[in-house]
C-alpha cells in the first residue's frame, strides 16, 4: 500500500465528542478526520456551536449529547449506526470541567465531574467497541500533560488562576486524565483481539486563535522546548495517524504532543 493511502480515511465513519468549540482540541480532530476523507459526526450539548462549526464542512453531521446523561450517549451511537451502518473511529474529546475547583471542593462536585468525564468515557468506549467488533476500529482518547505530571506552579504564577497553589487546574481533572491513560492501556489489552486499537494523545495548552497571548500562554510556552503552546493544526497529523492504517500496529500508546514540555 502506498504510504499516502495509509493516511486516507475514505469510507470510514468517525465520531468526535466535544467538537463544537472552534478554540478546542475537538475542532482540530473533526477537521483532520474530515479532510482525510472520513464521514464525521460531532457531538456536544451545545447544538448552536456544533451547527456553526459543521456549517463549514459539507456533510459533517451533528448530534446533541450531554455527558451527564447516559441516555444521550446511547442515542449518539444508535443514531450513527442507524444512519451510516457502522462506526470506525471514536475520538473521546469532550470534557466537563469543574471550573476553578479547589482542594476542598464539595464531594458532590467531585463526583459529578467523575461521572461526566470518567464514567462517560467508559460508556462511550464500551458502546463504540461493540459497534466496531465486526470490522475493527480505532479509539482515540484526548488526554493531557496533567494526566502525566504533577501541577507545574510556574505556569500559573500571577495569572489570577491560582490561590494558595491549589485552585487551578482542578484536582479532578488531574485525577481523570491520569486515569484515562491507564484505562487506554486496559481497553487496548481487551479489545486487541477484535482488531480495535485504543490510544491516547496527551497535549499541552492551546495557543489562542486570535493570537492574543495572556500571561498564562507566555509562561506555559516558556516551559516547552519549542517556545509555544499547541497550535491550531498541531494535533491534526497525530489524529489522522492514529485513526487510520498508518498506525495499524500501534495500540495502548500515549502519543505526547507537547512541544517537548514533558522532556524537561
Label each residue range with its predicted role.
Residues 2-5, 24, 158-161, 240, ...:
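Short C-terminal tail/terminal secondary-structure segment
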Amino acid at each position: 500500500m502506498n504510504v499516502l493511502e495509509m493516511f486516507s480515511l475514505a469510507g470510514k465513519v468517525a465520531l468526535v465528542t466535544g467538537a463544537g468549540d472552534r478554540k478546542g482540541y475537538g475542532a482540530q480532530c473533526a477537521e483532520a478526520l474530515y479532510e482525510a476523507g472520513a464521514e464525521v459526526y460531532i457531538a456536544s450539548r451545545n447544538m448552536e456551536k456544533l451547527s456553526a462549526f459543521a456549517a463549514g464542512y459539507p456533510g459533517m453531521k451533528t448530534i446533541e449529547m450531554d455527558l451527564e446523561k447516559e441516555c444521550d450517549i446511547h442515542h449518539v451511537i444508535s443514531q450513527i449506526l442507524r444512519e451510516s451502518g457502522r462506526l470506525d473511529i471514536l475520538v473521546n474529546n469532550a470534557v466537563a470541567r469543574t471550573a476553578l475547583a479547589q482542594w476542598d471542593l464539595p464531594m458532590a462536585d467531585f463526583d459529578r465531574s467523575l461521572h461526566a468525564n470518567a464514567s462517560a468515557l467508559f460508556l462511550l468506549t464500551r458502546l463504540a467497541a461493540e459497534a466496531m467488533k465486526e470490522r475493527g476500529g480505532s479509539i482515540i482518547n484526548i488526554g493531557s500533560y496533567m494526566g502525566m505530571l504533577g501541577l507545574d506552579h510556574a505556569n500559573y504564577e500571577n495569572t489570577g488562576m491560582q490561590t494558595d497553589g491549589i485552585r487551578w487546574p482542578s484536582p479532578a481533572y488531574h485525577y481523570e486524565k491520569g486515569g484515562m491513560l491507564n484505562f487506554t492501556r486496559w481497553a487496548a489489552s481487551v479489545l486487541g483481539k477484535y482488531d480495535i486499537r485504543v490510544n491516547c494523545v496527551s497535549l499541552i495548552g492551546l495557543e489562542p486563535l486570535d493570537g492574543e497571548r495572556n500571561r498564562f500562554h507566555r509562561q506555559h510556552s516558556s516551559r516547552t522546548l519549542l517556545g509555544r503552546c499547541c497550535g491550531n493544526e498541531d494535533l491534526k497529523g497525530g489524529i489522522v495517524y492514529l485513526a487510520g492504517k498508518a498506525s495499524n500496529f500501534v495500540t495502548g500508546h500515549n502519543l505526547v504532543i507537547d512541544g517537548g514540555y514533558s522532556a524537561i
